[in-house]
């Protein structure tokens, strides 16, 4: 089993490739000669941008849905803040000055790609150390130039609080954590209506590596790759994912999301089409998790626990979750609950059409699992098509139907554990092939 990746050293503690004074000079005197270019709308002078005060009233985030004298609401007006022309040098200068002045809101140009060609302390942009908001517009992108040396796009350090609105972050590549964004301990990241795509990390967190606090709102994290864990998101801190899509990412463990040692909350959205050696979708490793109203579908893994895995003293609650069409080459196509002090509660949910080559097509349980008002339908494995149990499973008002085992235990195969059907609550185990249950008291074979 893969062990959680340790947080990397704060990039500010590493040997600096460029002295910090140079970037202060850049931010205050105008950015020239840094081999950074952009494509898009013609740029204004970076010096003009750098010279503005980024902490005036106009630069602060809006706090309410007020209307101006013309009667227009917030959604009809440009967000308050300092405009940054379509020029990577100008963006670097603006962030540098924002850090110096205690934070700012920066409005990036629409239909613009800010093209970064040289790293600053392992990232294409200056480390975020204060509250900074980057507002994108239509088709605003920040990317690393394809021919440039490897670096991630953004690092959020202690005291930094970065908000991304309507932005695409792409092309980051690092031999450490966080292909696109690294959030260090004491840092915070919020993405709203943004896309993190096609980034690569040689270790953990192909899209985002979170060691602080990260919130992903109405955003997409897709097509990122990590050689270790967390193809989309690797988190050792607090992680909230709301109405977002973590899809088509690749990792050795936790293709979509890997959470270790803290808490992950996923609400709505999807974790779909991810690939991994172990657990294509969501891997909760020595952590706590709550998933509500999310589709966890079409994930694949060559190991165990493809849709969701709960392991290494972890707890997970899933409500109104659709875990369907996931495929494992070993066990636990839909849900895998590891041996020992691991606990899963599944309520008002569906585990359907999941497949495991060997055992536990729908659920593989070696810990403790509780199913309430849940359907385990149409899953398939060699043994234990619906559920394979080595631990304790309690079912309440749950249906285990139309599952298939090639050998035995079409519905439930109990292998030395405890299965409590609680049939008085309405639990039924029927229409499974070649049989409904093996070693399950109160279940007709």
Spell out what each predicted region is:
Residues 1-7, 11-46:
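Secretory targeting and sorting signals
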Residues 80-106:
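Acidic Gly/Asp/Thr-rich repetitive segments characteristic of extracellular carbohydrate-active
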Residues 96, 116-133, 143-164, 170-188, ...:
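Extracellular beta-strand-rich solenoid/capping regions of secreted or surface-exposed proteins
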Residues 104, 112, 130-132, 138-140, ...:
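The right-handed parallel beta-helix/beta-solenoid scaffold, focusing on the short coil/turn
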Residues 120-123, 147-155, 175-182, 201-209, ...:
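Extracellular beta-strand/beta-solenoid scaffold signature
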Residues 159-254, 261, 265:
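Right-handed parallel beta-helix
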Residues 395-445:
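Leucine-rich solenoid repeat scaffolds
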């Amino acid at each position: 089993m893969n062990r959680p990746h340790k947080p990397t050293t704060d990039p500010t503690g590493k040997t600096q490739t460029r002295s910090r004074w140079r970037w202060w000079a850049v931010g205050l005197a105008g950015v020239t000669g840094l081999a950074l270019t952009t494509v898009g709308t013609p740029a204004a002078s970076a010096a003009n941008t750098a010279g503005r005060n980024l902490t005036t009233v106009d630069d602060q985030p809006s706090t309410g849905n007020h209307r101006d004298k013309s009667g227009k609401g917030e959604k009809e007006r440009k967000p308050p803040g300092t405009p940054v022309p379509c020029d990577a040098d100008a963006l670097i200068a603006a962030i540098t000055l924002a850090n110096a002045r205690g934070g700012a809101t920066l409005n990036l140009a629409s239909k613009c790609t800010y093209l970064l060609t040289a790293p600053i302390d392992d990232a294409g942009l200056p480390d975020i150390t204060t509250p900074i908001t980057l507002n994108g517009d239509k088709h605003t992108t920040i990317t690393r130039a394809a021919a440039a040396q490897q670096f991630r796009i953004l690092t959020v350090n202690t005291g930094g609080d970065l908000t991304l609105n309507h932005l695409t972050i792409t092309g980051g590549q690092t031999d450490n954590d966080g292909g696109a964004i690294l959030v260090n301990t004491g840092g915070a990241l919020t993405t709203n209506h943004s896309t993190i795509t096609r980034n690569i990390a040689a270790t953990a967190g192909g899209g985002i590596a979170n060691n602080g606090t990260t919130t992903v709102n109405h955003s997409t994290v897709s097509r990122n790759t990590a050689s270790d864990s967390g193809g989309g998101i690797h988190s050792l801190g607090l992680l909230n994912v709301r109405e977002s899509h973590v899809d088509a990412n690749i990792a050795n463990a936790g293709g979509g999301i890997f959470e270790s040692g803290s808490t992950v909350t996923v609400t709505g959205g999807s974790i779909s089409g991810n690939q991994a050696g172990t657990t294509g979708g969501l891997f909760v490793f020595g952590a706590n998790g709550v998933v509500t109203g999310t589709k966890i579908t079409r994930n694949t893994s060559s190991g165990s626990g493809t849709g969701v895995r709960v392991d290494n003293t972890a707890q997970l609650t899933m409500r109104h979750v659709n875990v369907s069409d996931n495929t494992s080459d070993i066990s636990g196509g839909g849900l895998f609950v590891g041996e020992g002090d691991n606990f899963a509660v599944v309520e008002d949910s569906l585990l359907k059409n999941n497949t495991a080559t060997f055992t536990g097509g729908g659920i593989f349980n070696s810990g403790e699992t509780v199913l309430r008002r849940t359907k385990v339908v149409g899953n398939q494995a060699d043994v234990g098509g619906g559920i394979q149990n080595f631990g304790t499973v309690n079912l309440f008002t749950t249906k285990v139907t139309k599952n298939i085992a090639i050998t035995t235990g079409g519905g439930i195969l109990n292998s030395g554990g405890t299965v409590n059907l609680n049939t008085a609550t309405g639990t039924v185990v029927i229409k499974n092939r070649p049989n409904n249950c093996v070693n399950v008291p109160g279940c007709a074979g």
